Amino acid sequence: MLRIADKTFDSHLFTGTGKFASSQLMMEAIRASGSQLVTLAMKRVNLRQHNDAILEPLIAAGVTLLPNTSGVKTAEEAIFAAHLAREALGTNWLKLEIHPDARWLLPDPIETLKAAETLVQQGFVVLPYCGADPVLCKRLEEVGCAAVMPLGAPIGSNQGLETRAMLEIIIQQATVPVVVDAGIGVPSHAAQALEMGADAVLVNTAIAVADDPVNMAKAFRLAVDAGLLARQSGPGSRSHFAHATSPLTGFLEASA
């Protein structure tokens, strides 16, 4: 069971809504993933009416909606977008996302921290997308963010856990949930994140652009469950040396 702020989730896999060939395929994949929290970019939905092709089926499915501020470049723009989302969707949950460079889509740490502090004070449940910076993640936690979402690699790159060393530090020091977001490309990446101690992963591109998004979503669901179960089972320690699993000479001595 995963708790973030006032909500609990059975699934440790969060999903997105971008890049799917159709809203029907999107919903089939989300159902197959078992995800109970789904992000959506405010720039992609019609906030004036709930019969939007993306929004309507998500509301009907009963998943927790996590609007994100993708596309904004400053703290001020993010705060404005957050209030629009809260008014339109009736949720104070927000994935804070500020990336001014459209080529790399890397989060701006200064603007993110500034916006996070203000939004928390204004009653939002803030989940910030951020770089895998242990110092920044601790600062975001200190200003009241409900979780931190450090990247594994650049958004949509499918490179996996390129920031593993920093993620390990973030996980070790965090007192709020850590959700690895961005760069996860295959189910084994997700399993590794859960094994190393992450509380959840957010996956969008790897599922949406797969040849078979529905089966890929199932694969991610199984991988996340496997990674979590492996961690809870207490993996053996690593060693530079070999350790025999059975006596090497006992049977020889016994027969001598």
From Swiss-Prot:
InterPro entries: Aldolase_TIM (IPR013785), Thiazole_synthase_ThiG (IPR033983), ThiG (IPR008867). The gene is thiG. It is an enzyme of class 2 (transferase). It comes from the Bacteria. Belongs to the ThiG family. CDD domains: ThiG. GO terms for cellular component: cytoplasm. This is Thiazole synthase. It is found in: Cytoplasm. The active site is at 95 (schiff-base intermediate with dxp). Its EC number is 2.8.1.10. GO terms for biological process: thiamine diphosphate biosynthetic process. Pathway: Cofactor biosynthesis; thiamine diphosphate biosynthesis.
